[in-house]
Amino acid sequence: METIRLNKAEFNNVLQMASQMAGVSKTLPILDNVHLRIKDGTLQITSSDSEVTITKGYQLLYNTSEDCDIIFNPKSLCALLPIIADDEIDVENNGSDILVKYTNGDMSLPTFDVDDFPILDLDAQNAKSVTIEDCAGFAETIKDASSFIANDYIRPIMTAIVVHIAESGIEIYASDANILYFSKFSDKGNQDEKFILLPAKAIKPIYSLLKYSSDKSFTLLYNDTHAKFVCDGGSVTTRIMEGKYPNVKSVIPQTSKTDIVFDKKTVQDAIKRVSLSTNESKLGVFSINFDEAEISAGDADFRKVSKEVVEANIQTGQSLRIGFNLQKLSRAISVIEGPKITMCANDKDTATLWHNSDDNHTLVLVMPMRIE
């Protein structure tokens, strides 16, 4: 085989991204490897665990007259490429191994039978599709949602992130039963309604593909069993989780008696400091009155008590005393963008809704804790 010259940085970026699913499967040893294909001047690398497959490719700078199909374990090469100084490397396929050459040395890696490598894909001709604007925004939204999936083996459906496609738009949500993350991501959807339940392990590959894409939009293909995200010379195909996700929209309060505006950073910092005195329950109490809120916590066993006062602007309603798990509340607030956040509440025993004070497209519902 002829020697193929590759730009090291470009090849390394593609290899690192595309090899994410290699070694995830514990049942098929062949899936410890990646599939590298060169065809018609395009290099493409694929890894899979049989349920999630990521593929990334790019157009080669140097023309090659020879196509290539090889399977190899990427672990050593992923470690080598970032620590060699060369701008370019040479790759030779010798049949039973590949030889990667750089200025001061080389690395030989065994190759395996291409036919043994299973590829998970989706038949585009029999799939529905929707074009979604803002690759990076979608990536950040599913990353935020992934912070609130449940770790629940009894109800595995709650470990999913839901992408709800409807004619009215696209919604993304997830819940661990204590916190609900809900984003009205787009007003443009598809007339064929679909609830796509993404498994947690698909989120990182999808995020990597979309976040660093040079494309502004991506295509989402889907059928009853699979979803495929396509952009910028790459794709992630994942099995869709089976089952029916709870109707989370039914628990989102439509009205509130008390709306309170906080400075996000101020309240985050106060929660962080007060949390140092909580007991195992992580209970903290917000006592809101007029134009301020006292955040307090204590641990009677160790005689620790902390409290801080922060500015609070009551937009509607009146004073309120309500308890939260401060650790979970801090996590909920962290995914809300903007300098000001609003808490919408009805009483100390029902769910509160938190959102950007200037935008309610992203809502985080937080359940309170009982206080005496």
Language-model segments: residues:
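Structural preference for solvent-exposed beta-strand-turn elements
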Residues: M1-E372
